[in-house]
Amino acid sequence: MFTYFRGELIEASPDEAVIEVSGVGYLLSISATTYRQLPEPGREVLVLAHLHVKEDLMQLFGFLEEEERQLFRLLLSISGVGPKLALAILSGLQVHEIQEAIVSNMPERLFEITGVGKKTAARIVLELRDRILKLRPSGGTKSVSRLSESSMRDDAVNALVTLGFLRSVAQKAVTESLTSLRNPQVEDLVRDALLTIRTP
């Protein structure tokens, strides 16, 4: 539902930022890494967004770099890693340092971050090593394409869930839309998926 926000940065702290877009203020949780790269309040900024939906709670997360958003989403796929811990990891090390720790099989680097236990660090390295390697330039354009598709699928599914549809129904409809549409954007996926869901 939300891919990015372009607007005026109203205020920011090491863990939150408020961006005003067309008179509406959006509160986004951010990493310390993103905070250090933000401009001064009052300046225009473009922040990439991730909408996290869990039961009756919706929370927006903001990133200045696509690479950081991708890594955030990968971390969320690990059992035991929620958005709070994922942000702590992104705040504890630079994105390239986290990637290097994972591909070099060095869970001890992640264990140095407050809140990351030894088992969680080991699980992150074990489950993400191959996926991180595929995202690197040597992995080829197909890997980047797959990531982009996965990102759009997640955004479209989350948008449909926000509209009140069951996640299983949303996932099925979005998957069908990805198959039938050519080079779709998130908005195209949501629109086509809605037609699929509402067609008897």
Swiss-Prot record:
Domain notes: Has three domains with a flexible linker between the domains II and III and assumes an 'L' shape. Domain III is highly mobile and contacts RuvB.
Residue numbers spanned by region Domain II: 65-143
Gene3D superfamilies hit by this protein: 5' to 3' exonuclease, C-terminal subdomain, DNA helicase RuvA subunit, C-terminal domain, Nucleic acid-binding proteins
Annotated localization: Cytoplasm
Protein name: Holliday junction branch migration complex subunit RuvA
Lineage: superkingdom: Bacteria
Chain residue ranges for the region called Flexible linker: 144-148
InterPro entries with a match to the protein in the record: DNA_helicase_Holl-junc_RuvA_I, Hlx-hairpin-Hlx_DNA-bd_motif, NA-bd_OB-fold, RuvA, RuvA_2-like, RuvA_C, RuvA_C_sf
Membrane spanning residue stretches: none
Signal peptide positions (record): none
Xref: SUPFAM superfamilies: DNA helicase RuvA subunit, C-terminal domain, Nucleic acid-binding proteins, RuvA domain 2-like
Matching HAMAP family: DNA_HJ_migration_RuvA
Region (Domain III) residue spans: 148-200
Recorded family membership: Belongs to the RuvA family.
Keywords attached to this entry: Cytoplasm, DNA damage, DNA recombination, DNA repair, DNA-binding
A Pfam family per the record: RuvA_C
Primary localisation category: cytoplasm
GO biological process: DNA recombination; DNA repair
Region called Domain I, residue ranges: 1-64
Gene: ruvA
Subunit details: Homotetramer. Forms an RuvA(8)-RuvB(12)-Holliday junction (HJ) complex. HJ DNA is sandwiched between 2 RuvA tetramers; dsDNA enters through RuvA and exits via RuvB. An RuvB hexamer assembles on each DNA strand where it exits the tetramer. Each RuvB hexamer is contacted by two RuvA subunits (via domain III) on 2 adjacent RuvB subunits; this complex drives branch migration. In the full resolvosome a probable DNA-RuvA(4)-RuvB(12)-RuvC(2) complex forms which resolves the HJ.
One cellular component term from this protein's GO annotations in UniProt: Holliday junction resolvase complex
Organism: Chlorobium phaeobacteroides (strain BS1)
Gene Ontology molecular function terms on file: ATP binding; four-way junction DNA binding; four-way junction helicase activity
Function, in words: The RuvA-RuvB-RuvC complex processes Holliday junction (HJ) DNA during genetic recombination and DNA repair, while the RuvA-RuvB complex plays an important role in the rescue of blocked DNA replication forks via replication fork reversal (RFR). RuvA specifically binds to HJ cruciform DNA, conferring on it an open structure. The RuvB hexamer acts as an ATP-dependent pump, pulling dsDNA into and through the RuvAB complex. HJ branch migration allows RuvC to scan DNA until it finds its consensus sequence, where it cleaves and resolves the cruciform DNA.
